[in-house]
């Protein structure tokens, strides 16, 4: 059995930070409905599993089309935290993110994952592979696993939007 890859400590820290940035953008782009930017976070050959918005093995275009169609009429909040990261090579890594999401449909739809509800709060993990190409880290494989789903009842109070909505180009404007 080959010895595990041992990255340079500085490259490890820089790579881990870059990977965290990619995942933060993933959550923000989904929640602020920036579908045109979402696809840029993935390698062209990325594959997806465990998602209600794309079939297993879907490619990037199918995933973006599915998630934009499915989550377009929602208020969604995605949080990823407490990552575990293992560098598997100079330009590859495996990561597990603890995750929590809240999805509420605003168009009267009910949800197949939690029948008879207008949304859900979910808990689980993302299992992902990342690859650095041309100096840029991107997601090469994404799997969502679920530990728990709690329904948002149809008769739950109507959502109230925050006082100030997100600036979709806050970072990009500098």
Predicted segments, located by residue:
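Short, low-complexity N-terminal intrinsically disordered segments enriched in polar/charged residues
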Residues: 1-28, 32, 36, 40, ...
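A beta-strand edge to alpha-helix "cap/lid" segment located at domain peripheries
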Residues: 2-7, 72-79, 86-174
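Solvent-exposed, flexible loop/coil residues
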Residues: 17, 52, 151-153
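Generic alpha-helical secondary structure signal
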Residues: 30-33, 52, 67, 130, ...
């Amino acid at each position: 059995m080959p010895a595990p890859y041992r990255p340079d400590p500085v490259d490890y820290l820089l790579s881990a930070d870059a990977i965290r940035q990619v995942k933060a953008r993933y959550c923000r782009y989904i929640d602020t409905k920036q579908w045109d930017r979402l696809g840029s976070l993935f390698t062209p050959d990325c594959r997806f599993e465990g998602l209600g918005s794309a079939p297993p093995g879907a490619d990037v275009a199918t995933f973006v089309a599915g998630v934009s169609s499915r989550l377009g009429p929602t208020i969604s909040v995605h949080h990823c935290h407490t990552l575990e990261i293992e560098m598997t090579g100079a330009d590859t890594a495996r990561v597990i993110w603890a995750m929590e999401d809240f999805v509420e449909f605003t168009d009267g739809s009910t949800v197949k994952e939690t029948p008879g509800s207008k949304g859900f709060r979910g808990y689980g993990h993302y299992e992902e592979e990342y690859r650095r190409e041309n100096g840029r880290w991107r997601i090469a494989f994404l799997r969502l696993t679920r530990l728990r789903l709690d329904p948002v009842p149809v008769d739950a109070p109507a959502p109230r939007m925050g006082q100030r909505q997100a600036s979709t180009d806050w970072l990009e404007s500098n």
